[in-house]
């Protein structure tokens, strides 16, 4: 699925099942919440935090939950792009070009990355 197709799919879903988009501010808050849930999984899977004994997501060390939370973040981001008229394909292409021009030589000699 392309980014454009994802935006279109989310838009159809919202119109068919979601009634309408939440307000932009509400979706910003929901995005923050979803990023926090992703951060919790990351801190337990890759960081120093331990899984709670009662948390079933820890059974596979959060592998399934990690993907689910990333998808939730993407969903809300697609909603926000749709409701604000942002073409994420176009913006991602511009962002990659900007980073390439700005950072093409930036990390080549970074000893922390070469280790």
Task: State the predicted function of each range.
Residues 1-70, 74-115:
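Flexible "arm" and connector segments at domain edges
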